[in-house]
Amino acid sequence: MSAIKITNVAVLHNPAPFVSPFQFEISYECLNSLKDDLEWKLIYVGSAEDETYDQLLESVLVGPVNVGNYRFVFQADPPDPSKIQEEDIIGVTVLLLTCSYMGQEFLRVGYYVNNDYEDEQLKEEPPTKVLIDKVQRNILSDKPRVTKFPIDFHPEEEQTAATAAPPEQSDEQQPNVNGEAQVLPDQSVEPKPEES
Protein backbone atom coordinates (compact mmCIF):
# COMPACT_ATOMS: atom_id res chain seq x y z
CA MET A 1 0.00 0.00 0.00
CA SER A 2 1.24 3.46 -0.84
CA ALA A 3 2.01 5.85 2.01
CA ILE A 4 0.84 8.78 -0.13
CA LYS A 5 -2.60 9.06 -1.72
CA ILE A 6 -3.13 11.91 -4.19
CA THR A 7 -6.65 13.20 -3.66
CA ASN A 8 -6.76 15.99 -6.27
CA VAL A 9 -4.67 17.89 -8.80
CA ALA A 10 -6.29 21.06 -10.13
CA VAL A 11 -4.80 22.97 -13.05
CA LEU A 12 -5.07 26.69 -12.29
CA HIS A 13 -5.23 29.55 -14.83
CA ASN A 14 -6.02 27.38 -17.83
CA PRO A 15 -6.03 28.15 -20.74
CA ALA A 16 -3.21 30.68 -20.47
CA PRO A 17 -0.58 32.40 -22.61
CA PHE A 18 2.37 30.15 -23.46
CA VAL A 19 4.74 32.49 -21.61
CA SER A 20 2.82 32.46 -18.30
CA PRO A 21 3.80 30.21 -15.35
CA PHE A 22 2.14 26.86 -14.75
CA GLN A 23 0.18 26.45 -11.51
CA PHE A 24 -1.19 23.25 -10.02
CA GLU A 25 -3.05 22.93 -6.73
CA ILE A 26 -2.07 19.53 -5.36
CA SER A 27 -3.94 17.81 -2.53
CA TYR A 28 -2.74 14.58 -0.97
CA GLU A 29 -3.05 12.43 2.11
CA CYS A 30 -0.15 10.88 3.99
CA LEU A 31 -1.16 7.53 5.49
CA ASN A 32 2.20 6.76 7.17
CA SER A 33 4.71 9.32 8.44
CA LEU A 34 7.68 9.79 6.12
CA LYS A 35 11.09 10.85 7.37
CA ASP A 36 12.32 12.22 4.06
CA ASP A 37 10.93 14.83 1.63
CA LEU A 38 8.64 14.25 -1.32
CA GLU A 39 10.09 15.56 -4.57
CA TRP A 40 7.63 17.05 -7.06
CA LYS A 41 8.77 17.75 -10.63
CA LEU A 42 7.14 19.33 -13.66
CA ILE A 43 8.55 18.30 -17.06
CA TYR A 44 7.62 19.79 -20.44
CA VAL A 45 8.03 17.35 -23.35
CA GLY A 46 9.55 19.46 -26.13
CA SER A 47 9.50 16.78 -28.82
CA ALA A 48 7.71 13.45 -29.13
CA GLU A 49 10.67 12.01 -31.07
CA ASP A 50 13.62 13.25 -28.98
CA GLU A 51 13.68 13.42 -25.17
CA THR A 52 16.74 15.69 -25.21
CA TYR A 53 14.24 18.51 -25.82
CA ASP A 54 12.41 17.74 -22.54
CA GLN A 55 12.69 20.58 -20.02
CA LEU A 56 12.57 20.22 -16.25
CA LEU A 57 10.51 23.30 -15.40
CA GLU A 58 10.63 23.01 -11.61
CA SER A 59 11.56 20.63 -8.85
CA VAL A 60 10.52 21.22 -5.23
CA LEU A 61 10.97 19.28 -2.01
CA VAL A 62 8.07 19.05 0.45
CA GLY A 63 8.50 17.46 3.84
CA PRO A 64 9.19 15.66 6.04
CA VAL A 65 5.56 14.57 5.87
CA ASN A 66 3.50 13.47 8.89
CA VAL A 67 0.19 11.63 8.78
CA GLY A 68 -2.59 13.95 7.59
CA ASN A 69 -4.01 15.89 4.65
CA TYR A 70 -1.96 18.42 2.71
CA ARG A 71 -2.51 20.96 -0.05
CA PHE A 72 -0.12 23.33 -1.82
CA VAL A 73 0.19 25.27 -5.07
CA PHE A 74 3.05 24.11 -7.27
CA GLN A 75 4.19 26.89 -9.61
CA ALA A 76 6.70 26.51 -12.44
CA ASP A 77 8.08 28.80 -15.10
CA PRO A 78 6.99 28.17 -18.70
CA PRO A 79 9.32 26.25 -21.01
CA ASP A 80 12.12 28.12 -22.74
CA PRO A 81 10.94 28.35 -26.38
CA SER A 82 14.54 28.67 -27.61
CA LYS A 83 15.09 25.06 -26.44
CA ILE A 84 12.15 23.74 -28.49
CA GLN A 85 12.36 23.10 -32.22
CA GLU A 86 10.32 25.71 -34.08
CA GLU A 87 8.04 23.08 -35.68
CA ASP A 88 7.22 21.57 -32.25
CA ILE A 89 6.00 24.75 -30.53
CA ILE A 90 2.57 24.83 -32.19
CA GLY A 91 0.54 21.65 -31.74
CA VAL A 92 0.01 19.01 -29.08
CA THR A 93 2.64 17.97 -26.55
CA VAL A 94 2.77 16.48 -23.06
CA LEU A 95 3.32 17.89 -19.57
CA LEU A 96 4.42 15.47 -16.82
CA LEU A 97 3.89 16.02 -13.10
CA THR A 98 5.85 13.47 -11.06
CA CYS A 99 6.32 12.70 -7.39
CA SER A 100 9.23 10.74 -5.90
CA TYR A 101 10.33 9.61 -2.47
CA MET A 102 13.99 8.91 -1.76
CA GLY A 103 14.77 8.91 -5.47
CA GLN A 104 11.95 6.48 -6.31
CA GLU A 105 9.22 7.82 -8.58
CA PHE A 106 5.82 6.55 -7.44
CA LEU A 107 3.42 8.85 -9.30
CA ARG A 108 3.29 10.32 -12.80
CA VAL A 109 0.42 12.43 -14.08
CA GLY A 110 0.54 13.19 -17.80
CA TYR A 111 -1.47 15.93 -19.46
CA TYR A 112 -1.87 16.70 -23.14
CA VAL A 113 -1.16 20.35 -23.89
CA ASN A 114 -2.40 22.07 -27.03
CA ASN A 115 -0.39 25.13 -28.08
CA ASP A 116 -1.97 27.29 -30.76
CA TYR A 117 -2.62 30.86 -31.74
CA GLU A 118 -5.68 32.42 -30.17
CA ASP A 119 -6.17 34.73 -33.15
CA GLU A 120 -8.14 33.01 -35.96
CA GLN A 121 -6.18 34.77 -38.71
CA LEU A 122 -2.88 33.55 -37.27
CA LYS A 123 -4.33 30.01 -37.07
CA GLU A 124 -5.34 30.11 -40.73
CA GLU A 125 -2.17 31.83 -41.97
CA PRO A 126 0.58 31.04 -39.44
CA PRO A 127 3.72 33.16 -39.74
CA THR A 128 6.95 31.45 -40.79
CA LYS A 129 8.51 32.28 -37.40
CA VAL A 130 6.38 31.47 -34.34
CA LEU A 131 5.13 34.56 -32.49
CA ILE A 132 5.50 33.10 -29.00
CA ASP A 133 3.72 35.97 -27.25
CA LYS A 134 0.61 35.22 -29.36
CA VAL A 135 0.56 31.49 -28.54
CA GLN A 136 -1.95 30.17 -26.04
CA ARG A 137 -1.58 26.86 -24.22
CA ASN A 138 -4.52 24.74 -23.16
CA ILE A 139 -3.86 21.87 -20.74
CA LEU A 140 -6.46 19.14 -21.26
CA SER A 141 -6.95 18.80 -17.51
CA ASP A 142 -10.10 16.68 -17.66
CA LYS A 143 -8.24 13.69 -19.15
CA PRO A 144 -4.98 13.18 -17.26
CA ARG A 145 -3.06 9.93 -17.61
CA VAL A 146 -2.19 8.75 -14.08
CA THR A 147 0.48 6.09 -13.58
CA LYS A 148 1.39 4.71 -10.14
CA PHE A 149 4.56 2.77 -9.40
CA PRO A 150 4.97 0.58 -6.30
CA ILE A 151 7.95 1.67 -4.18
CA ASP A 152 9.30 0.99 -0.71
CA PHE A 153 8.38 3.98 1.45
CA HIS A 154 10.28 2.66 4.50
CA PRO A 155 13.49 0.97 3.28
CA GLU A 156 15.29 1.86 6.53
CA GLU A 157 12.84 -0.31 8.53
CA GLU A 158 13.53 -3.35 6.38
CA GLN A 159 17.27 -2.73 6.61
CA THR A 160 17.12 -2.37 10.42
CA ALA A 161 14.96 -5.48 10.78
CA ALA A 162 17.31 -7.50 8.58
CA THR A 163 20.38 -6.59 10.64
CA ALA A 164 18.68 -6.70 14.07
CA ALA A 165 17.65 -10.34 14.15
CA PRO A 166 18.22 -13.32 11.87
CA PRO A 167 15.04 -14.62 10.23
CA GLU A 168 13.31 -17.50 11.97
CA GLN A 169 13.21 -20.83 10.19
CA SER A 170 9.52 -21.54 9.71
CA ASP A 171 7.20 -22.91 7.07
CA GLU A 172 4.46 -20.50 8.15
CA GLN A 173 3.99 -17.11 6.53
CA GLN A 174 4.42 -14.36 9.14
CA PRO A 175 1.76 -11.62 9.00
CA ASN A 176 2.84 -8.08 8.20
CA VAL A 177 1.53 -5.94 11.08
CA ASN A 178 1.65 -2.15 10.97
CA GLY A 179 1.03 0.12 13.96
CA GLU A 180 -1.92 2.46 14.06
CA ALA A 181 -1.41 6.08 13.08
CA GLN A 182 -3.14 9.14 14.42
CA VAL A 183 -4.78 11.36 11.78
CA LEU A 184 -3.81 15.00 12.10
CA PRO A 185 -5.95 17.95 10.95
CA ASP A 186 -5.54 19.45 7.46
CA GLN A 187 -2.15 21.13 7.25
CA SER A 188 -0.75 23.59 4.77
CA VAL A 189 2.78 22.93 3.59
CA GLU A 190 5.12 25.42 1.95
CA PRO A 191 7.30 23.75 -0.69
CA LYS A 192 10.98 24.42 -0.19
CA PRO A 193 13.32 24.87 -3.17
CA GLU A 194 15.60 21.97 -3.96
CA GLU A 195 19.17 22.48 -2.88
CA SER A 196 21.76 22.41 -5.63
Swiss-Prot record:
Single GO BP term: regulation of cell size
Annotated protein name in UniProt: Probable histone chaperone ASF1A
Classification of source organism: Eukaryota, Viridiplantae, Streptophyta, Embryophyta, Tracheophyta
Tissue distribution of the protein: Expressed in leaves and flower buds.
Keywords: Chaperone, Chromatin regulator, Nucleus, Transcription, Transcription regulation
Compartment list: Nucleus; Nucleus, Nucleolus
Biased composition (Basic and acidic residues): 146-157
InterPro entries associated with the record: ASF1-like, ASF1-like_sf
Protein's organism: Arabidopsis thaliana
